[in-house]
Amino acid sequence: MTKNKIPEVLILGLPNAGKSTLVNALSKRKTSIIGSTPNTTRDKVTTTLEFEDEKKLLISDLPGFLEDPDDINIKFQDNILRYVNKANHILFLIDVQSKNYSGLDSIFKLINNNNLQNKTTTVFNKAENFEIENLDKRMYKYIFNTELFISAYHKKGLDVLENILKKLSKKSSNVNDRKSSIVIVG
C-alpha cells in the first residue's frame, strides 16, 4: 500500500457464498447485482466504505471462484490471482452450510501458495440460525487469523466485521479520493 492509496479489501469465495450481498450490506447501497444464479458477478466491483474520522477503505466483490471455469469464465478467474496479490486484506467468505470442500480447498491453496494467510480473515456467512458448535469439523482448516459468523442478508454480525474494516481503513486526507469503480475484464 502506498501513501496515497486507499487500502483495498477483497471478498473471495465460491459462487453464491453471499459476496455481493455482503458488499451491499457494508456499503448500505446496491453496489453489486445479486442473483441466485451462480456467477451473477462476472467482473470486479469496487466501492468505497467511509468511516468516522474521514477514514476510507475500498471493498471489492469478485466473481465466485471456480475450480474448473468454462471458456466464458476463464478470463475472470485468471484475474483473481492478480487481484488477491495486490489487495491489502482478503475476506474469505464461506457459506456456513457449504459442502463444496473441493472448491474451498482450491481457495485455501490459493491463499497458502501465495503466502496470503496473514492478510486473510475467514467469514462464515448465512449463519443467522446457526450454532457455532455445529460447524463441520472440516471447515476449521479454512480459518485464518480470525473467524467471524455473520448473515449479510439479515445484517447480523456485521458490527464486528465493520470494526475490523475500520482498523484497516486510512484517513482520507492521506489518500486519493475515489468513490467507486468497476473493472470490466475481457
Q: Where in the sequence are the language-model features?
A:
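Canonical P-loop GTPase G-domain recognition
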Residues: N118-T121, E128-S181
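Conserved G1/Walker A P-loop phosphate-binding module
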Residues: M1-Y83, I94, K167-G186
